[in-house]
Amino acid sequence: MMLSWKQLILLSFIGCLAGELLLQGPVFIKEPSNSIFPVDSEDKKITLNCEARGNPSPHYRWQLNGSDIDTSLDHRYKLNGGNLIVINPNRNWDTGSYQCFATNSLGTIVSREAKLQFAYLENFKTRMRSTVSVREGQGVVLLCGPPPHSGELSYAWVFNEYPSFVEEDSRRFVSQETGHLYIAKVEPSDVGNYTCVVTSTVTNTRVLGSPTPLVLRSDGVMGEYEPKIEVQFPETLPAAKGSTVRLECFALGNPVPQINWRRSDGMPFPNKIKLRKFNGMLEIQNFQQEDTGSYECIAENSRGKNVARGRLTYYAKPYWLQLLRDVEIAVEDSLYWECRASGKPKPSYRWLKNGDALVLEERIQIENGALTITNLNVTDSGMFQCIAENKHGLIYSSAELKVVASAPDFSRNPMKKMVQVQVGSLVILDCKPRASPRALSFWKKGDMMVREQARVSFLNDGGLKIMNVTKADAGTYTCTAENQFGKANGTTHLVVTEPTRIILAPSNMDVAVGESVILPCQVQHDPLLDIMFAWYFNGALTDFKKDGSHFEKVGGSSSGDLMIRNIQLKHSGKYVCMVQTGVDSVSSAAELIVRGSPGPPENVKVDEITDTTAQLSWTEGTDSHSPVISYAVQARTPFSVGWQSVRTVPEVIDGKTHTATVVELNPWVEYEFRIVASNKIGGGEPSLPSEKVRTEEAAPEIAPSEVSGGGGSRSELVITWDPVPEELQNGGGFGYVVAFRPLGVTTWIQTVVTSPDNPRYVFRNESIVPFSPYEVKVGVYNNKGEGPFSPVTTVFSAEEEPTVAPSHISAHSLSSSEIEVSWNTIPWKLSNGHLLGYEVRYWNNGGEEESSRKVKVAGNQTSAVLRGLKSNLAYYTAVRAYNSAGAGPFSATVNATTKKTPPSQPPGNVVWNATDTKVLLNWEQVKAMENESEVTGYKVFYRTSSQNNVHVLNTNKTSAELLLPIKEDYIIEVKATTDGGDGTSSEQIRIPRITSMDARGSTSAISNIHPLSGYMSVLLFFIVNALW
């Protein structure tokens, strides 16, 4: 079809405008929705939303019930953008269906219909309601009769006074369909006034009707009668897809009927069906087509039953299966536009263009909802809407049709500047300019026209295909495209390269865990091409940064060798080297088998258990590419430290055996078992533990150890032992058999200790002789029988305290603070046990016996030294023996007086003189005071300054002569000696090592020490009889 010059100018203008501004028809962002407005609302306006995008920006208008709303004339309506605001809404004028129209230069679209309704609830008429009189046991219905209203209501009833509401149960029911109150069987407690309460669910307004008095008749009680269904659902009830359906059913009767529900076809109810209000209501949520059918309500009591039936039918508003999409198409082409919707009943279709019904003509036809327009022209452009509707609703789908006319243009889809291919391949050179209608294309290589031949062909979309490319095909190709509105051309340079080849490919390898390998991948390629290597492991691209601890790419520019370090089992698999250039790609694969220690065996089970054996079975785990050679069994109990190897039959379990018997188990112990597999590489991870099992019981085999005893109280024989560990008790009911007899008697006395943890038994009998020997043995038993006894050992009965006192007690003073006490031991036969020692009690002349102090000596000692005593004072003392049972009687009392204290005056004016061989000491005589011991002599204490070993020289003179052969300083002290001990020490004298021929000093001039010379030795002129 030829277009006029005016159309060409218009097309040209539209094309430029479209390129600059990207024009777009209106598309709704927000559409109005159904709205219910409370009449008594404090908000005095309603806003209906409408917003669309488009370029240029759309403008808006509205219709009410198909008539335009003129906002310039009616000031109750205002536009805010696309939103319509209704001021002071009136239910008489503003109720109806609203639609929004959005328009720009490309067309108009119409919104969905939005219904505006007004909700209100008027008051009940003020009139008295008649009294309802019934017999006790009779059913009754109290009518509500709601006042005029609009909008959904809910119902309740007040009993006597507000807000005491009637509680619904199996006897009382409030219908939310009619508002009536149903009482299945009236009782005396029901007498009173009943008021219907109606609430608007929209406005939340509540109104109360007039009270209805309910009284009991006095002419008797109603007898029993079968149920009478008063509340039932319609015989046919349409239900919308996705809605919530509620069916009510309630019956009067005496006794109170029970309500049950079922489907007539016997199918069970799905979980989404709920029974509410004591079965008086059946609720189906999210109603779907499979929920249709006949439902039955059965009311039943002891007098009979009645059934109400109704059928639920399914309907669905239209919903889209296929929406319209914007179409841009060239002039003179044909359009086939399909919109598809579903619903029940099946929807019908109609089309709008720019908000008006589409006018059909020879070119424009609608069939089954699909729109066909042939021989398109620019005037067909606009906004189209498909409407699908049935009696339950309608839906809109909108799209823009752009009919374009333009000369070929490569600006939006330019040809590639260069195409690289390899020798022998196939190449397609694209030529796809934007053109309406589609352009015709022809090709040139350089200045020569390209003609079709065996290897060269032209494609329908204008492209050029060349097969089995050769080097001669390289060059510059130009495509010229032309239609009735003009022509344009584009150029592509074709580069032909040599193919890439892998000259050193990876090969299959077999390695052990921990090794490192290199998989080679070296290529030969066209030098004009850049090359890139990639490695795939089991189909996944190797990330050398993430997996750098194991994988590294090595080699030169033409090499992509893969190094794998410290190979693990997880690295087994297929490796592919992928080599890619700008024109081709090649690859080579290799299998890498990694052999390692086997994986853990699986499904470890205990098939049979006895008292000392367990039959095990398991299945083989992964062999890590190295066959399993052997298996080992390990066990664990609550008493073991970790897992322990156990003996099995067979003793060596080869890799093909998956059963074994564990032997030498302890009876009545809970065991877990696991299996460890080994191959040439080494031992693998152990299996998961088996379930815990307990071996069967057996008679005990281990006797208690460390059987001994002794001690205890008078007339007792105490026997002790180490308890048998739980893991060696071999069964439940474990205890001990204790056997004993006096030494020399043949008959055993036996008793039982039932506690397995008890380590002792005490036998009490007044006839037991103290510290008499008994033969003792301890055996074991459990539910399965008795076990062995321990070896016989001798245990002594309990001791008694000694009955005699030590004899020949004597005491004498050793010094001013010490007295020695001595005695004779008591005979063994009179000790009544093993004698532990003696206790010495003592007190001074001025003290009381009750305040005496004690000293104990162990064993058979026959003397003790009392220390820390006061000087020149008489002390009294007595001795008694003791054993483990206690102490015996004290001996007779003896006494001794401590000696006087040593002199408190130290030796004074100690003077020393030294020659080359001698040191002479002199000091003043010490005189004792009247209360001090007389001086009997003196002690000279001396040592080298570098040692603590002190030597003592006794003398009865006030002088001493020494040879000092050691080349060290000496420290010297002098003390007086008496019967009462040593006196106070003189001041220390330091004699320096001798370095000169003559030296002297004294305690009064110790600081003036002269150095001594020569080799020093000590010559003792008196007998050394003590060390200090």
From Swiss-Prot:
Residues 684-714 are annotated as: Disordered. Pfam families: fn3, I-set, Ig_3. GO terms for biological process: cell adhesion. The keyword Repeat applies. This is Contactin-3. Contactins mediate cell surface interactions during nervous system development. Has some neurite outgrowth-promoting activity. Disulfide bonds join C50-C100, C144-C196, C249-C297, C339-C386, C431-C479, C521-C577. Residues 1003-1028 form a propeptide. It is a lipid-anchor; GPI-anchor. One of its GO terms (cellular component) is side of membrane. PROSITE patterns: FN3, IG_LIKE. Specifically expressed in brain. Ectopically expressed in tumors expressing endogenous intracisternal A-type particles (IAPs). The gene is Cntn3. Its main location: membrane. Glycans are attached at N65, N193, N377, N468, N489, N765, N860, N895, N913, N931, N956. Interacts with PTPRG. Residues 32-117, 122-209, 227-313, 318-402, 408-497, 499-593 form the Ig-like C2-type domain. SMART domains: FN3, IG, IGc2. The keyword Glycoprotein applies. Residues 1-19 form the signal peptide.
